């Protein structure tokens, strides 16, 4: 039912506000320093520590800078922990630019696939509009990184260093997005006119142009490189003329992405069900995005078990909530906004997802956990925002934040129950691109 605000109502609102003298004190603090600073809970500093009962041997952090490549950084961070542990080279890093290059090409190909598949839909249909809205962007999921690594391998960071356009993807993403949207109109018209032969030639031309744009912005990937590093014992290692796939299979052959499952906690969806996100798959004919939705305690138990076995855990989360970038605190009580405004802002995890308040905005890596008599107190988190953020790039997260704002963890299937193992291999319920899990 429509309601029109009246002068009398507005005068009453003002009178109610001014009735309480504390409101003016709070208002001055908020207006001078911002609502987050004014509501900052100093007690968090004494409640979160940097000591963990289980902790991996960590190294220097990476820095995604002004890009949406957290999903790729977190995946390569998990792999570099494995490499560092196996070969005693904890400061060794993989090139994010290398896999980013191939993601641009593969994702463009998938975009053209979707545009052709939806050519009979109106241009303003939700499906087509969503595909167009995300053209050229660089956010992603764990399986997207896994698909790229499986198909193209990995290279050391020195073999394909970062460039201006990988550190700040804004300009390139805009240019690529514009091109893809322009191409979409051409491909839709050809499909609607039934010109299949012309579609094949045109798509190939468009993909060649995407390759050209990406090579100009990022640089062409190396076909071979020399593996050269000094391990933690200062011993020198050199192996010449490795291809990226040879490097992957020889040095990380024990990592099989098929052995890993993404457990998700989405209370707005049915539990014990395997969901897919086909609109986000980035490599045609490769690893699909699959999420097994289970109660939160299973994400906790599997993550702890994997950490205790010495393996890092990729996790998807909403880092934009209750986070202090400077200190690296992730705590549900960090900003007391309810107290500042005098209103109840609390929502359940399910309601946050339903309304778009909650989202998977970031991916990081779990590298430690602190338990006290079986109760989880806090987690150690490796971020990819450089060493000027948090404690030399590492964050500390209380368990309430984990429960409220973590939505996905990637764990080996050996940590699943028998029922969950069956579900992970079972039928997939595909979700649309606008679903809360997308």
Curated annotation (Swiss-Prot):
UniProt KW keywords: Aminopeptidase, Cytoplasm, Hydrolase, Protease, Thiol protease
EC number: 3.4.22.-
Annotated localization: Cytoplasm
GO MF terms, alphabetically ordered: cysteine-type aminopeptidase activity
GO biological process terms held by the UniProt record: homocysteine catabolic process; proteolysis; response to toxic substance
Pfam families in the cross-refs: Peptidase_C1_2
Enzyme active site: 70, 362, 383
A Gene Ontology cellular-component term: cytoplasm
InterPro entries, alphabetized: Papain-like_cys_pep_sf, Pept_cys_AS, Pept_his_AS, Peptidase_C1B
The keyword Phosphoprotein is assigned to this record: no
Top enzyme class: hydrolase
Record note on temperature dependence: Optimum temperature is 32-37 degrees Celsius.
Record note on pH: Optimum pH is 4.5.
Protein purpose: Can hydrolyze internal peptide bonds in Met-enkephalin and bradykinin; however, hydrolysis of alpha-, beta-, and kappa-caseins is not detected.
PANTHER family given in the database record: BLEOMYCIN HYDROLASE (PTHR10363:SF2)
Homology family: Belongs to the peptidase C1 family.
Protein name: Aminopeptidase E
Protein's organism: Lactobacillus helveticus (Lactobacillus suntoryeus)
Lineage, uppermost ranks: Bacteria, Bacillati, Bacillota, Bacilli, Lactobacillales
Gene that encodes the chain: pepE
């Amino acid at each position: 039912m429509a309601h029109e605000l009246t002068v009398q109502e507005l005068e009453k609102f003002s009178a109610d506000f001014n009735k309480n003298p504390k409101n003016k004190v709070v208002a001055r603090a908020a207006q001078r320093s911002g609502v987050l600073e004014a509501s900052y809970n100093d007690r968090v500093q004494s409640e979160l520590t940097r000591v963990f009962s289980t902790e991996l041997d960590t190294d220097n952090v990476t820095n995604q800078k002004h890009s949406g490549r957290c999903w790729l950084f977190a995946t390569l961070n998990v792999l570099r922990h494995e490499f560092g542990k196996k070969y005693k080279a904890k400061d060794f890093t993989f090139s994010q630019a290398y896999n980013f290059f191939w993601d641009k090409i593969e994702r463009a190909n998938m975009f053209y696939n979707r545009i052709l598949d939806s050519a009979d839909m109106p241009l303003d249909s939700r499906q087509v509009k969503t595909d167009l809205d995300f053209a050229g962007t660089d956010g992603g999921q764990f399986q997207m990184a896994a698909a790229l690594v499986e198909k193209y391998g990995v290279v050391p960071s020195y073999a394909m260093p970062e460039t201006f356009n990988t550190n700040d993807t804004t300009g390139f993403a805009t240019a690529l997005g514009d091109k893809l949207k322009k191409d979409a109109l051409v491909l839709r018209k050809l499909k609607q006119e039934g010109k299949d032969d012309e579609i094949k030639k045109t798509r190939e031309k468009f993909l060649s142009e995407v390759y050209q744009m990406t090579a100009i912005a990022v640089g062409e990937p190396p076909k071979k490189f020399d593996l050269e590093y000094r391990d933690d014992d200062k011993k020198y290692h050199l192996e010449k003329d490795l291809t990226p796939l040879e490097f992957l299979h020889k040095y990380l052959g024990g990592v099989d992405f098929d052995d890993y499952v993404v457990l998700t906690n989405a209370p707005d969806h049915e539990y014990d069900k395997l969901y897919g996100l086909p609109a986000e798959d980035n490599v045609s004919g490769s690893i699909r995005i699959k999420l097994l939705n289970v109660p939160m305690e299973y994400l906790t138990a599997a993550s702890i078990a994997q950490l205790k076995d010495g393996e890092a855990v990729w996790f998807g989360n909403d880092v934009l909530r209750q986070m202090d970038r400077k200190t690296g605190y992730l705590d549900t009580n960090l900003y007391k906004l309810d107290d500042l405004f005098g209103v109840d802002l609390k929502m359940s995890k399910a309601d946050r997802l339903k309304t778009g308040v909650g989202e998977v905005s970031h991916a990081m890596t779990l590298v430690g956990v602190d338990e006290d008599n079986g109760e989880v107190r806090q987690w150690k988190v490796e971020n990819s925002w450089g060493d000027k953020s948090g404690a030399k790039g590492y964050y500390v997260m209380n368990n309430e934040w984990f429960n409220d704002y973590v939505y996905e963890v990637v764990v080996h299937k050996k940590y699943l129950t028998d029922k969950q193992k069956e579900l992970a291999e079972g039928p997939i319920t595909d979700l649309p691109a606008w679903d809360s899990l997308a």
